[in-house]
Curated annotation (Swiss-Prot):
The gene is PIG-V. GO terms for cellular component: endoplasmic reticulum membrane; mannosyltransferase complex. Disruption phenotype: Homozygous lethal. The keyword Membrane applies. It is found in: Endoplasmic reticulum membrane. Keywords: Endoplasmic reticulum, Glycoprotein, Glycosyltransferase, GPI-anchor biosynthesis, Membrane, Transferase, Transmembrane, Transmembrane helix. GO terms for biological process: GPI anchor biosynthetic process; rhabdomere membrane biogenesis. This is GPI mannosyltransferase 2. It is a multi-pass membrane protein. Mannosyltransferase involved in glycosylphosphatidylinositol-anchor biosynthesis. Transfers the second mannose to the glycosylphosphatidylinositol during GPI precursor assembly. Required for the GPI-mediated endoplasmic reticulum exit and proper targeting to the cell surface of chp. Required for GPI-mediated membrane attachment of chp, qsm and Cont. Essential for microvillar stability in the rhabdomere.
């Protein structure tokens, strides 16, 4: 089954790549006034560079420009601090390894190829992780396959191929969830800690994934009788979590040193400086006078940067001019709100029926999906009231497997049994329409969810 899932995932990525290639060549590219990675005039484009730009150029738009800029120049502009480092830094180091081989490509082309190739590989791996996680929790091959199928053609599928961190985060979070959900009851702390650190370094919402090791470790202590090695396990789990948080704070310290300490003066290339002047961006190395967040008691830049540069905040996006973006996000948000509410309603009835210590343990043992649905419900609520509403589809599609489990419940055993005038049919139309339209629009630099 692993081979079958891998073939499905790879085929879906090749379809997206083909649609992007055709759309990028057939339609005129939109040129919005947004961030574009500044490129040195010293880079001479060879014919291979032009072929790569022609074939993959549609996969670098919007946030992809930021990730590729960080991969090449690190955090030279303050607005790039909205993007966490794991994905672009991995792309950077793999790109440097490829460049060391002596391939005659520009750095811009190498980074784009590496970014897309990395997402291809991680997508196939994450599809298999989703299949395995679903099988561990539900022991249902049909549901596991349908979940993987929907994942491969999810409504935000273009963002899992483009130079975005969605695929890396999906891979990291699914790996963490699978490690926490292992039925053996013994945690592999090194793997768990690595996956947790990857989640924290990949996306800001990775912080919520801390709840998984905490919940499943507490669940194990509750359901099992006290064992002689409980203290050792508690120590190991504590060190694992603190280690992952410590790695995240190493990144925070690096950013603080880069932007707030007066003795840090990066030697920026001239084209980076020129673009900063043109766009009125704050360059790193300005010292504590450069930005207000340097004076905060806890000088974490993320919230400030999101608020200052993107106007992200509680209900700030609720404006009439954003109605099209609300409509784009409506299918995902309404789907998730309803199914999470329905799950919690049934859970509340089960809790009410078993208000005893033994009944509580039974609930914890039987409702293994509770932390996943709670996580999904929190993310859905945050998307609804806080973030730019149009990112809800890709955020939820990459951050939680719950969407795929709920969707898989509506799917028939085979696609031959699929009827368009049914819930499964509506789901099929939604996923295929968003996949196709999203790929066409995104690859030509038009706004998309």
């Amino acid at each position: 089954m692993t081979e079958k899932v891998t073939k499905l995932a790879l085929a879906s990525r090749l379809i997206v790549l083909l649609v992007q290639l055709v759309a990028n060549g057939a339609l005129p590219e939109h040129k919005p006034d947004v961030f574009r990675m500044p490129v040195s005039s010293d880079q001479n484009a060879s014919w291979i560079d032009k072929v790569i730009k022609r074939c993959l150029g549609g996969l670098r738009h919007w946030d992809g420009e930021y990730f590729l800029h960080i991969a090449e120049n690190l955090y030279s502009y303050e607005n790039t601090l909205a993007f966490y480092p794991l994905y672009p830094v991995v792309v950077r180091h793999v790109g440097q390894a490829v460049e060391a081989i002596g391939i005659s490509l520009s750095q811009e082309s190498i980074l784009l190829v590496v970014a897309v190739a990395l997402n291809f590989w991680l997508f196939c791996e994450s599809a298999n992780l989703l299949f395995q996680l679903t099988q561990v929790l539900f022991n249902d091959l049909n549901k596991s396959w349908n979940a993987a199928l929907i994942y491969c053609f999810n409504p935000a599928t273009i963002f899992f191929t483009a130079a975005y961190s969605e695929t890396f985060f999906a891979y990291s979070s699914l790996h963490l969830m699978l490690e926490c959900s292992k039925p053996t009851g013994s945690f592999r702390y090194l793997r768990l800690g690595t996956a947790l650190a990857a989640c924290l370094l990949c996306r800001s919402n990775g912080l919520i994934t801390l709840g998984y090791p905490l919940y499943f470790f507490g669940r194990q202590l509750l359901l099992k009788n006290k064992e002689p090695n409980t203290c050792m396990q508690l120590t190991q789990m504590t060190l694992t979590i603190l280690g992952a948080i410590g790695i995240l704070h190493t990144y925070y310290f690096y950013i603080y040193r880069l932007y707030c300490l007066p003795n840090t003066r990066p030697n920026h290339p001239q084209h980076i400086v020129d673009y900063a002047v043109e766009r009125k961006y704050l360059l790193s190395g300005q010292g504590s006078e450069g930005s207000p967040w340097c004076q905060y008691t806890l000088p974490f830049p993320y919230t400030y940067v999101q608020s200052h540069y993107w106007d992200v905040g509680f209900l700030r996006y609720y404006k009439w001019k954003q109605l099209p973006n609300f409509l784009l996000a409506l299918p995902m948000l309404s789907f998730m709100h309803w199914h999470c509410y329905d799950y919690m309603q049934h859970l509340a009835k089960a809790v009410w029926a078993k208000l005893t210590p033994s009944g509580f343990k039974e609930l914890i043992r039987d409702h293994t999906t509770f932390p996943f649905v709670l996580h999904a419900a929190i993310l859905t609520l945050v998307c609804t009231v806080y973030v730019h509403i149009q990112v809800s589809t890709r955020l939820l599609a990459s951050a939680t497997p719950v969407f795929y489990w709920f969707a898989a419940d509506h799917m028939p055993k085979t696609l031959a049994q699929l009827k368009l005038r049914s819930k499964a049919g509506a789901l099929f139309v939604w996923c295929t329409t968003y996949s196709l339209v999203g790929t066409v629009l995104f690859s030509n630099n038009y706004p998309w969810t």
